[in-house]
């Protein structure tokens, strides 16, 4: 069982230095427009994913006129107390630690604090293209399966290399099909793992959705 007991924000978005305590299992956040309700939720997202829900650029989350941010959360995970701290240094370097133990790779943290975001643009999962649905599914499976995330990282990196190679074919006229074959072969292992895990999840999940829909 996971529970967030408190969170402290330093120079995060519109917060100069502010702390919030969450004493109940269910918490409602209310306030006038512009006071920072969504920013508070985004700070919680930061503790779960080490990034903002809204932007990939960490600098966009720094309070205007300042440098660096610090987000600290006090958690209870399976009856044990944990302190999670995310720091963006003045140099732009980002650090994340749980109980003062820093991660070598941020991907090691994903799934430790499961997080579900419900937002108006979720309608895109139904009305939008398949890319939005794949992204949603990937985010969910990465929290459930660390190995899935590692395969996904490798797969995306190879796809980038493959696309760059195809672009060079067009720009230079030099067609290195041997290298293209190597990249295609490297895609097989992570691609099969990703496909199988997506299929496995959907076989389990779709009957539940159909039952709720009916």
Protein language model features and the residues they cover:
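Pre-Walker A-like glycine/lysine-rich segment at the N-terminus of P-loop NTPase domains
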Residues: 1-46
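Short hydrophobic/aromatic segments of transmembrane alpha-helices and their interfaces
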Residues: 3, 43-44, 114-117, 184-185
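Generic alpha-helix structural propensity
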Residues: 24, 35, 39, 56, ...
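ABC transporter nucleotide-binding domains
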Residues: 25, 43, 112-114, 136
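Short amphipathic alpha-helical segments enriched in hydrophobics
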Residues: 44, 48-52, 166
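Nucleotide-state sensing region of NTPase/ATPase domains
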Residues: 49-126, 130-132, 141-144, 148, ...
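An accessory alpha-helical subdomain
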Residues: 121-212
């Amino acid at each position: 069982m996971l529970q967030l007991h408190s969170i402290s924000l330093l120079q995060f978005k519109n917060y100069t230095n502010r702390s919030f305590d969450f004493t109940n299992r269910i918490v409602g956040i209310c306030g006038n427009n512009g006071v920072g309700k969504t920013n508070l939720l985004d700070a919680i997202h930061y503790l779960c994913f080490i990034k903002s829900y809204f932007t990939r650029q960490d600098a966009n989350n720094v309070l205007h006129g300042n440098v660096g941010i610090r987000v600290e959360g006090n958690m209870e995970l399976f009856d044990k107390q944990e302190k999670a701290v995310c720091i963006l240094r003045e140099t732009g370097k980002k650090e994340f630690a749980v109980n003062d133990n820093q991660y070598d790779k941020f991907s090691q943290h994903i799934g430790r604090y499961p997080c579900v975001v419900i937002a108006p643009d979720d309608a895109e999962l139904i009305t939008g293209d398949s890319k939005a649905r794949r992204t949603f599914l990937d985010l969910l499976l990465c929290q459930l399966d660390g190995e899935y995330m590692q395969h996904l990282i490798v797969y995306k990196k190879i796809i980038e290399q493959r696309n760059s190679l195809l672009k060079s074919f067009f720009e230079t006229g030099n067609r290195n099909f041997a290298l293209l074959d190597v990249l295609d072969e490297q895609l097989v292992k992570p691609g099969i793992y990703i496909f199988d895990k997506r299929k496995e999840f959907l076989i389990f999940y779709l009957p539940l959705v159909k039952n709720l829909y009916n």
